[in-house]
């Protein structure tokens, strides 16, 4: 049996493609997420339907629950053996402990998003070398780090064909198929993709409200991890993540999709004549986020600078 570990709805979409490559091998699915909402629950169920066995857990960031959940994962998975393991978030401490608790023959990785192809992202760095982290690793038995898992990965499955990834051995997969519907001539619907860029909700709300007004946004699709609510825009209420939703809707409507630096627009670029994408350049206060705009330029994305 193979093991596949997901942390986001996008990873579930990728996982479905990977599972399809092994039609005669059963999979055990794991869904670890930092939030619980209908979107995450919907994709967790989709993953479970593809797997012979399934485990899910909502993760917490506070120290007490983090340690409690590490012990729970170790107890749940200790001694289990898998042929191949597939994982995206090699930086996640709880995933590192889960991997330390099991035996496996082969480790493979897959994309978490543009973080995989943006230089100097956290996947190209190592874990924090703090005394606290070292003590946790030693006392609770973590055998792995970001870089040791990169080195161990046999194959990396990527939705970004032609780009350098965290390891050299890559196998491209097509996340979504092109839509061959006829070009729609109706009025364009402007959609803003939600993205919690800043730690403070107030800053995210202020930025979104400015963009909504400036670009005449008709609809807002919140990020799966968003917990705040905007007042002056119509929400798209769907269990589907952006890629699934927009490729259904573009068959009968024409869209212009605005984002800050979401990898989602890369996933649907050139998939339909009824979808246009625009990236809005902002002050992110994060070099890894800023590097996304260089990537967008390379891909030919229309980038509009709205920095104040």
From Swiss-Prot:
* Impact after mutating residue 25 to T: In strain: ATCC 15742 / P1059
Q: How does activity depend on pH?
A: Optimum pH is 6.0. Active in a broad pH range of 4.5-10.0. Low activity is found at pH 10.0 and no significant activity is found at pH 4.0.
According to its UniProt record, which residues of this chain constitute the active site? 201 (proton acceptor), 223 (proton donor)
Recite the UniProt keywords alphabetically. Answer: Glycosyltransferase, Transferase
> What are its applications?
Has been used successfully in the preparative scale synthesis of sialyllactosyl sphingosine (lyso-GM3), which is an important glycolipid and an intermediate for synthesizing more complex glycolipids such as gangliosides.
Q: Which Pfam families match?
A: Glyco_transf_52
| EC number(s) recorded for this UniProt protein | 2.4.99.-
Q: What does the entry list as the binding residues for CMP-N-acetyl-beta-neuraminate?
A: 221-225, 242-243, 262-263
- What does the entry comment about cofactor binding? Divalent metal cations are not required for the alpha-2,3-sialyltransferase activity.
Q: Which InterPro entries match?
A: Glyco_transf_52 (IPR012477)
GO MF, one example: glycosyltransferase activity
According to its UniProt entry, what is the function of this protein? Answer: Catalyzes the transfer of sialic acid from the substrate CMP-N-acetylneuraminate to lactosyl lipids as preferred acceptor substrates in vitro, forming alpha-2,3-linked sialosides. Beta-1,4-linked galactosyl lipids are better substrates than beta-1,3-linked galactosyl lipids. The natural acceptor substrate may be cell surface oligosaccharides in lipooligosaccharide (LOS), whose sialylation has been demonstrated vital for the virulence of P.multocida.
Which family does the similarity line name? Belongs to the glycosyltransferase 52 family.
Q: What is this protein called?
A: CMP-N-acetylneuraminate:beta-galactoside alpha-2,3-sialyltransferase
Q: Which organism is it from?
A: Pasteurella multocida (strain Pm70)
Q: What is the lineage of its organism?
A: Bacteria, Pseudomonadati, Pseudomonadota, Gammaproteobacteria, Pasteurellales
């Amino acid at each position: 049996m193979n093991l596949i570990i997901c942390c986001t709805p996008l990873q579930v979409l990728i996982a479905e493609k990977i599972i399809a490559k092994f039609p005669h091998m059963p999979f055990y699915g794991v869904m670890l997420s930092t939030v619980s909402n209908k979107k995450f629950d919907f994709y967790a169920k989709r993953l479970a339907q593809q797997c012979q066995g399934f485990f899910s857990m909502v993760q917490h960031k506070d120290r007490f629950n983090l340690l409690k959940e590490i012990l729970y994962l170790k107890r749940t998975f200790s001694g289990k053996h898998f042929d191949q393991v597939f994982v995206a978030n090699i930086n996640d401490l709880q995933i590192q402990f889960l991997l330390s608790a099991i035996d496996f023959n082969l480790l493979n990785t897959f994309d978490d998003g543009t973080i995989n192809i943006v230089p100097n992202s956290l996947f190209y760095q190592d874990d924090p070398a703090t005394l606290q982290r070292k003590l946790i690793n030693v006392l609770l038995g973590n055998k792995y780090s970001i870089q040791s898992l990169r080195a161990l990965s046999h194959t990396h499955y990527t939705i970004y064909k032609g780009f350098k990834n965290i390891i050299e051995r890559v196998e491209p997969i097509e996340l979504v198929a092109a839509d061959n519907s006829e070009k729609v001539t109706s009025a364009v619907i402007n959609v803003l993709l939600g993205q919690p860029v800043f730690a403070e909700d107030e800053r995210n709300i202020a930025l979104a409200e400015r963009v909504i007004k400036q670009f005449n946004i008709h609809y807002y699709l919140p990020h799966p991890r968003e917990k705040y609510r905007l007042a002056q825009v119509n929400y798209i209420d769907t269990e589907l993540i952006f890629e699934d939703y927009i490729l259904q809707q573009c068959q009968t409507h024409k869209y212009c999709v605005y984002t800050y630096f979401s990898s989602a627009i890369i996933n649907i670029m050139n998939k339909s004549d009824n979808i246009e994408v625009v990236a809005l350049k902002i002050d992110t206060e994060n070099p890894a986020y800023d590097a996304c705009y260089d990537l967008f330029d390379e891909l030919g994305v229309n980038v509009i600078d709205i920095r104040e």
